[in-house]
């Protein structure tokens, strides 16, 4: 496991270990941290390879995730890789890391991937494109985080529509939960 040495990384690791339960002690053979100020995580990847790990959980942020994927590929380390949802954006992580290097990595995300042609059609896509052109014309259309921001904003729009003129905290929370 590679994780950021702060509350974000430690909390993500704790959740992972909690999920593994008693098996965590035997399944995780190496836990290595990095600092957000580190220029690269190359040395950490070399150390993880040297540990003999055949499975790797990448709990990093996008910049470091791309470095990890690329470095593991460069040094021939081919563990089964799991990438956290924070860093699985195709356009800003996987492509910069290299398509060959990114092939076979497991991850999950809860929004449509803007680089996937099957999602680049229909009213939702057209609305997203129109929004980006109007409000964020320099934004990358292939960036999951732009899609995420848009979907969060649209969720709030729906909540406020349902709340109508009754914009009390109680009613807004009621509509959000409904």
What are these regions (language model features)?
Residues 1-75, 118, 123:
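Extracellular/periplasmic Venus flytrap/periplasmic-binding protein
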């Amino acid at each position: 496991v590679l994780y950021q040495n702060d509350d974000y990384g430690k909390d993500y690791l704790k959740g992972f270990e909690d999920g593994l339960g008693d098996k965590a002690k035997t399944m995780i053979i190496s836990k290595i941290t990095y600092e957000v100020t580190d220029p690269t995580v190359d040395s950490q990847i070399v150390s993880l390879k040297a540990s003999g790990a055949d499975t790797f959980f990448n709990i990093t942020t996008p910049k470091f995730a791309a470095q990890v994927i690329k470095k593991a590929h460069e040094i021939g380390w081919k563990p089964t890789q799991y990438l956290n949802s924070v860093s699985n954006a195709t356009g800003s992580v996987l492509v910069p890391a290299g398509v060959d290097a990114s092939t076979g990595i497991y991850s999950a995300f809860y929004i449509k991937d803007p680089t996937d042609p099957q999602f680049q059609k229909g009213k939702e896509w057209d609305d997203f494109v129109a929004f980006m052109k109007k409000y964020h014309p320099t934004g990358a259309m292939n960036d999951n985080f732009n899609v995420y921001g848009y979907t969060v904003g649209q969720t709030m729009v729906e909540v406020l529509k349902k709340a109508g003129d009754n914009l009390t905290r109680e009613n807004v929370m009621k509509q959000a939960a409904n």
